[in-house]
Amino acid sequence: LSQTADDQRGSGNRSALGRLISVDERTFADDYWGRKPLLSRASELQESFDDLMTPAAVDELISHRGVRTPFARMAKDGSLLDKSQFTASGGFGAEMTDQLDSAAILSAFADGHTLVLQGLHRLWPPLIDFVRDLVDDIGHPSQVNSYITPASSKGFSPHYDVHDVFVLQISGEKRWILHPPVHTHPLSNQPWSDRKNAVEERAIEAPHLDTVLQPGDALYLPRGWIHSAEALGDTTIHLTIGVSSFTRYDVAHNLLGVLQEDAELREPLPAGIDLTDADAVLPYVDRVVDDVANLLQQLKNDEPARRRIAERLGRRFADITRPEPVGPLRTVSFMNALDEDSAVVWRQGLTASISRSENKIHLGLRDKTVSLPDECADAIAQLQSGKPCRVSELVGLDSNSAIVVARRLLREGVLVPAP
């Protein structure tokens, strides 16, 4: 969790995470995060999720937004429907053949297929904003899918996910059955299909939770928890917010990446070695174990090297998350009228590493580096705090310099006009 929740974000002056849980954020972090499910009833939460998704919004996405695969898939009884059965060309001027075909989806849906709309954090404006706030709250990359299930249909058989999930019930009722993990904290390369038999056996045992979600309810599922869901009565819609949490394994993976700098470890094994003979390979395994142990011991006393490992995690996070979108036309208009009274703010969710050289300060972004004179350092630190400020308030810069710097950072997508 972020150390400071911004109470002004999210509807109803609650943080994005706060809207999804019936306990306070610290209790969630200490007692539930990655440990056990949390069921939060609508009566325990302050508001519905109608601002995020509705049945009308689903129809709009299907019929009027030109959504293409892989942003959608359909399934029935655990089997995926070939995309050719629910996509088609959009006709003259839009000949791409993988666009959603609303009539074909109607037919498949009426036949009992569940529709999954994927990547809604990149498609649907309310969810773009909400997920950006949630990433700030929870500190891990997040994404959103929507599951639209026909009456009394089960979209997918019992399975587990390799990411944490928040389930938000939008409309209709859906029965959820949960069982404890057969593999705790699975990594992304450890899917449930690798343990299909164990999952099926666990799924016939007495459930940890058997409940019906109604509109406005929310359910948190740590990764690895086995679950299945069945629509009851009318069509049901729920959102799943998937959270791809960074783990200690990620730290270890980046730590071991340091070992590639060791020339001896990069040496080839002997020519003629029989790699199928474990006894022949074992001495080299033992030697590498000793070498790695020695290098790790050296890392304990090398704070700069450990810091570089931490920075690698930050770069990975920046690479797989996205800051708030910018409005190109609005920004250009704002830049043209920029003066010392204009208010700017750091672009939400934008990660920048700071370095200095040759009287310059460098902002390392995901896809480029922005360099400015060293006298901008205090102003950059001020802006990185995330608080809006007027151009005239930029620390250490005179009026003309402040305007030049603000305009440059707006153009580079580092700053945005303050609301």
Residue ranges of model-derived segments:
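Active-site region of the double-stranded beta-helix
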Residues: 2-31, 44-217, 225-275
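Long, charge-rich, low-complexity alpha-helical segments
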Residues: 2-8, 13-15, 20-23, 28, ...
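Secondary-structure transition/turn motif
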Residues: 43-44, 162, 364-369
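Glycine-rich, charged/polar anion/phosphate-binding loops
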Residues: 223-227, 348-349
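C-terminal amphipathic alpha-helical segment
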Residues: 256-332
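Acidic, low-complexity/disordered tracts enriched in E/D and polar residues
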Residues: 300-383, 407, 418-419
